[in-house]
Amino acid sequence: MNIEVLKSKIHRVKVTQAELHYVGSITIDEALMEASNIIENEKVQIVNINNGERFETYVIKGEKNTGVICLNGPAARKVAVGDIVIVIAYASMDFEEAKKWKPTLIFPDANNRLI
């Protein structure tokens, strides 16, 4: 039996941009992607701390070490610049394997930089 488990989490980053008329996605600083083990085009869940919204989209690689967190397309309506969000990726794995699984969690600073 396979179950979904937490794979990666970028905890409490600040939304730096919201681009409504861009094809949907979230643009994430490449340094944050690398540290969290999230790859381009991966499906992620976004949880907005400020308004309680939860939604899914996919990842676009942003310029490295810029701190960019940009919600694009319709997702831009679910955030405001300055909102704090959590980015979560999940993986499907065997139940027994999942018992031993350790997700990758990162906790960037207030400027979306690695600590």
UniProtKB/Swiss-Prot annotation:
Coarsely, its chief localization is cytoplasm
According to its UniProt record, this protein's enzyme class is lyase
**Cofactor binding description:** Binds 1 pyruvoyl group covalently per subunit.
Q: Which cysteines are joined by disulfide bonds?
A: none
Catalytic positions are: 25 (schiff-base intermediate with substrate), 58 (proton donor)
How is this chain modified after translation?
Is synthesized initially as an inactive proenzyme, which is activated by self-cleavage at a specific serine bond to produce a beta-subunit with a hydroxyl group at its C-terminus and an alpha-subunit with a pyruvoyl group at its N-terminus.
**Where does the UniProt annotation locate this protein?**
Cytoplasm
The gene that this protein is the product of is panD
- Recall the GO molecular function terms of this protein's record: aspartate 1-decarboxylase activity
User: Which Pfam family, any one of them, does this sequence belong to?
Assistant: Asp_decarbox
InterPro entries, alphabetically? Asp_de-COase-like_dom_sf, Asp_decarbox
User: Where are the annotated coiled coils located?
Assistant: none
The name under which this protein is listed is Aspartate 1-decarboxylase
Write out the GO cellular component annotations.
Answer: cytosol
Write down the chemical reaction(s) this protein catalyses: L-aspartate + H(+) = beta-alanine + CO2
Name the GO terms of the biological process aspect.
Answer: alanine biosynthetic process; pantothenate biosynthetic process
Instruction: Tell me which HAMAP family the record gives.
Output: PanD
Give the residues the record marks as binding substrate: 57, 73-75
Give the record's keywords alphabetically: Autocatalytic cleavage, Cytoplasm, Decarboxylase, Lyase, Pantothenate biosynthesis, Pyruvate, Schiff base, Zymogen
